[in-house]
């Protein structure tokens, strides 16, 4: 019996919650192959790649989320973090500003802008 996409997603999220990001990427990559247009899977995979410091892969996943959901404030913030880790502060700041505009109550978004301005 094969695992459902949802069970793979849940397994990946559980691994993330336990601090096992590398294991999370395995389950989440399988889920992504089945449903590549599912933003929740792509976001969780981006988080997993970010936690294992695979900045390029994290960037790619957060960009995919934004293609699927352009107004996802967290995806803009997370993409900014991945870009910042790659030394692309100006590009990161643009995404922090978008995230902060979309969700002005999220102080941590505004803090990243102040840190880079």
Predicted regions: what is each one?
Residues 18-30, 52-64, 86-98:
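Structural signature of tandem alpha-helical TPR/SEL1-like repeats
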């Amino acid at each position: 019996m094969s695992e459902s996409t949802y069970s793979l997603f849940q397994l990946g999220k559980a691994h993330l919650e336990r601090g096992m990001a590398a294991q999370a990427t395995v389950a989440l990559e399988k889920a992504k192959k089945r449903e590549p247009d599912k933003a929740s899977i792509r976001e969780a995979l981006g988080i997993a790649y970010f936690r294992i410091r695979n900045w390029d892969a994290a960037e790619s996943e957060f960009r995919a989320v934004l293609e699927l959901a352009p107004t996802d404030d967290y995806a803009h913030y997370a993409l900014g973090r991945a870009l910042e880790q790659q030394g692309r502060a100006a590009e990161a700041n643009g995404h922090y500003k978008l995230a902060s505009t979309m969700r002005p109550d999220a102080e941590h978004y505004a803090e990243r802008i102040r840190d880079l301005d």
